[in-house]
A protein has these predicted regions:
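Conserved glycine-centered short motifs in functionally critical loops
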Residues: 2-109
């Protein structure tokens, strides 16, 4: 993603997604990086065959911008064929999703 990056790390417990903004730590850069991740995430999860519990650690954004991130993620996942449910935000500002597993993930092949 432009002006940032994100990492997808499958663990035994869940899939962790960490979004970073590189050197720009402004809220605007955080929102931009999070929205770019939201558009790309369904494709990346599908390519890797990842599902189950997914926890996103977004780049820092104000609470008022959380709805914009949720809308972007929901729009992106609506276009995807794998069922994905939004669980909600944790007290620590992480976003939880639940995604159906429709095939073995690429790490287990």
């Amino acid at each position: 993603i432009n002006n940032g990056n994100y990492y997808i790390e499958p663990t035994k417990a869940f899939v962790a997604i960490d979004v970073n903004t590189a050197s720009d730590i402004s809220f605007a850069a955080g929102l931009k990086a999070n929205l770019a991740m939201a558009k790309d995430l369904p494709r990346q999860l599908r390519l890797r065959g990842l599902g189950g519990q997914i926890v996103i650690d977004p780049a820092p954004i104000p609470k008022r911008d959380r709805k914009a991130l949720e809308r972007a993620l929901k729009a992106a996942f609506r276009k995807d064929t794998v069922e994905t449910n939004f669980v909600g935000w944790t007290a620590m500002g992480l976003l939880e999703l639940q995604r159906a597993r429709n095939r073995p993930n690429w790490l287990n092949l």
